[in-house]
């Protein structure tokens, strides 16, 4: 299923365009971004959008992730019996497991407090087989059980993707290093600092940090060393206004989607002009 297409979460709104929109929503829910009371993301800033079941936002988040999980479950279930080389099928299954682990990791962070204080509290429903409209829904289980599934998916994917080399034209595809990066994040949330550091070092061994000079040149090249998972946009691809690139336009502070989600002058004034963050 397209992970960056308009309406991929079922909300069919200009701020419903898959993983990039969910990343924007998550940014607005954090403590380091503020909203001035306008724009769509106000409803995320005040947590209204995530906690009310009768409005578009929580339905968008829930639908996108579980629609993705269900499609991945079909791949995981049936790929072994499909035609093709065994190694190719191993890699495909590894990528599906990795993305399913990522999806449950995202759901766990959206619908429960952090693992360190909430592992015995409700997690999210876990589905590992394809479902249809009449499938009986599953209970939430505990957050610890959710993280057990996340780790199972990601560690299995890590081993299955051994030796897989992705094309630079498709940075959206999981390879082993991307899986290790997600595992580092998962262990960090679980406060398992040693494992988080171990996996972060594995990533850094393959993708060195961006230099200060490269950092100052901007973020328009998906081949920049620090970018290990992303979307390559080509001139032939055009989703019009319903795209992350239209949504991220911030040249006009009166832009209808972003009036409340733009770097303030007061924030810019905190940094010296010679500092890398200012540049």
Model-identified regions with their sequence ranges:
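Aromatic-residue-lined binding/catalytic grooves and analogous aromatic/hydrophobic interfacial grooves
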Residues: 155, 176-210
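Short coil/turn linking the two alpha-helices of tandem helical-hairpin repeats
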Residues: 108-115, 165, 189-191
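Second-shell loop/turn segments in exported
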Residues: 55-62, 83-85, 133-143, 169-170
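Short coil/linker segments at helix-helix boundaries
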Residues: 110-144, 148, 152
């Amino acid at each position: 299923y397209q992970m960056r297409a308009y309406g991929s979460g079922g909300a069919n709104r200009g701020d419903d365009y898959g993983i990039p929109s969910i990343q924007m929503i998550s940014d607005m829910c954090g403590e380091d971004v503020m909203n001035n009371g306008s724009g769509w993301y106000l409803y995320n800033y005040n947590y209204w959008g995530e906690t009310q079941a009768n409005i578009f936002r929580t339905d968008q988040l829930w639908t996108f992730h579980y629609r993705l999980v269900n499609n991945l479950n079909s791949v995981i279930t049936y790929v072994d019996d499909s035609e093709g080389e065994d190694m190719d099928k191993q890699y495909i299954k590894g990528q599906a497991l990795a993305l399913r682990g990522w999806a449950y990791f995202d759901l766990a962070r959206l619908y429960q407090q952090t693992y360190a204080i909430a592992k015995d509290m409700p997690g999210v429903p876990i589905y590992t087989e394809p479902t249809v409209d009449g499938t009986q829904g599953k209970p939430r289980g505990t957050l610890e059980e959710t993280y057990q599934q996340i780790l199972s998916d990601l560690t299995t994917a890590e081993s299955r993707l051994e030796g897989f080399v992705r094309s630079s034209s498709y940075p959206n595809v999981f390879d082993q290093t991307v899986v290790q990066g997600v595992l580092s994040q998962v262990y960090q949330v679980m406060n398992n600092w040693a494992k988080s550091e171990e996996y972060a070092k594995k990533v850094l061994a393959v993708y060195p940090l961006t230099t200060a000079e490269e950092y100052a040149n901007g973020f328009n090249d998906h081949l920049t060393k620090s970018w290990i998972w992303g979307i390559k946009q080509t001139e032939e691809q055009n989703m019009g206004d319903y795209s992350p690139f239209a949504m991220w336009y911030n040249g006009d502070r009166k832009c209808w989607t972003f009036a409340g989600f733009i770097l303030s002058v007061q924030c810019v004034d905190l940094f010296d002009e010679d500092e890398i963050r200012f540049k």
